[in-house]
């Protein structure tokens, strides 16, 4: 049995999913692969190839006390809570093409691939990718007390490019993407995802809570950019900055959706919207670091028509959109800057079974 789950990039809507606002995200054709076969023991033997580690877990292990970040055990706990009981041992290999701790969801890919692996073995009927998304979200966020939203799990499980409404219903629709040959470059600056997400989430939610105390029926998704200053007197200046950034990013995401749904989307217009989104992340939420800023400046000077930081920020990767004739120069100059992990990728259909 082989289960493959892709990386993901957020095109529009970073730092929106945990607010219940929509995102546009894309699964890309770089994969984490889980492969395995049964053994004659009660052990799940994990060969973590990229980490050069072997880990063995007894299928009867107590799962009541698990350290946060132990994604394998949390997957087993989540599956068990949904009636998926692993009844025999397996020798399992895990190998990945996905940059680790770089903003393209290596952890979520691991969780989705493992869940899909065990569901294929123990659940005879076909399950929906939305169900896998929900199990992955439960395992990574709810069980572990994480601060993220549902973008990663839904994007990876369902594949392609999706517009995801991250409110109560988690409705999503697939969008035909005009983008080809993404450049993704990892800064190598280690980030602390949950800490960053928690801080920004708390600040923004506090601002929204204070506003809703004055306007109990108000819905964040219904606030227009033109209305933002109406709320300035209700909250302090710092909170207002985060609130304003959330509304701006929401507006950009909806504008991008409108363009993407056209028969012939304008790539230059989409690139400009992406740059606007990046500028909010950089200047209002302040999630970039100096190396990321230098990488972005390099892409801009070398002809990129779109660019942004990917993920929670504080390090990680950038996404670059550029015509083919500019791509090699961008990649070459990034390498000269000391950026060692650079890939070109395209859209992925999502989970693969082999």
Give a label for each model feature.
Residues 20-40, 158:
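Structural signature of FAD isoalloxazine-binding scaffolds in flavoprotein oxidoreductases
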Residues 1-10, 33-70, 78-81, 155, ...:
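C-terminal nucleotide
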Residues 109, 317-321:
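FabD-like malonyl-/acyl-CoA
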Residues 1-9, 18, 67-177, 300-301, ...:
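Gly/Ser-rich oxyanion-binding loop with an adjacent helix/lid
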Residues 314:
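Glycine-rich phosphate-binding loop
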Residues 20-22, 100-104, 191-195, 282-283:
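A generic structural signal for short coil/turn motifs at secondary-structure boundaries
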């Amino acid at each position: 049995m082989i289960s493959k789950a892709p990386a993901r990039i957020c095109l529009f809507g970073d730092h929106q999913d945990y607010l219940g606002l929509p995102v546009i995200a894309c699964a890309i054709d770089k994969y984490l692969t889980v492969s395995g076969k049964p053994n004659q023991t009660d052990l799940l033997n994990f060969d973590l190839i990229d980490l050069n580690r072997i880990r063995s877990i007894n299928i009867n292990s107590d799962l009541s006390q698990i350290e946060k970040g132990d994604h394998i055990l949390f997957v087993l706990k989540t599956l068990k809570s949904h009636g998926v009981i692993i009844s025999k041992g397996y020798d399992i290999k895990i190998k990945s093409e996905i940059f680790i701790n770089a903003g393209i969801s290596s952890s979520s890919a691991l969780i989705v691939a493992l869940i899909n692996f065990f569901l294929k073995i123990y659940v005879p009927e076909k399950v929906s990718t939305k169900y896998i998304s929900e199990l992955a979200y439960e395992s990574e966020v709810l069980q572990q007390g994480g601060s993220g939203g549902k973008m990663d799990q839904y994007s990876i499980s369902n594949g392609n490019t999706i517009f995801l409404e991250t409110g109560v219903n988690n409705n999503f629709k697939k969008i035909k993407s005009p983008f080809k040959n993404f450049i993704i470059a990892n800064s190598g600056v280690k980030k602390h995802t949950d800490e960053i997400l928690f801080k920004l989430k708390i600040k923004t939610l506090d601002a929204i809570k204070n506003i809703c105390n004055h306007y109990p029926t108000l819905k964040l998704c219904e606030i227009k950019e033109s209305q933002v200053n109406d709320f300035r007197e209700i909250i302090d200046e710092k909170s207002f900055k985060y609130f304003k950034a959330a509304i701006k990013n929401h507006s950009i995401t909806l504008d991008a959706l409108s363009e993407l749904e056209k028969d012939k989307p304008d790539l230059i217009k989409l690139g400009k919207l992406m740059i606007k989104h990046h500028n909010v992340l950089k200047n209002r939420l302040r999630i970039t670091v100096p190396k990321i800023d230098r990488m972005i400046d390099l892409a801009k000077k070398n002809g990129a028509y779109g660019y942004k930081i990917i993920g929670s920020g504080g390090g990680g990767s950038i996404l670059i959109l550029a015509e083919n004739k500019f791509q090699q120069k961008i990649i070459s100059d990034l390498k000269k800057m000391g950026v060692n992990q650079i890939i070109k990728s395209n859209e992925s259909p999502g989970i693969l079974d082999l």
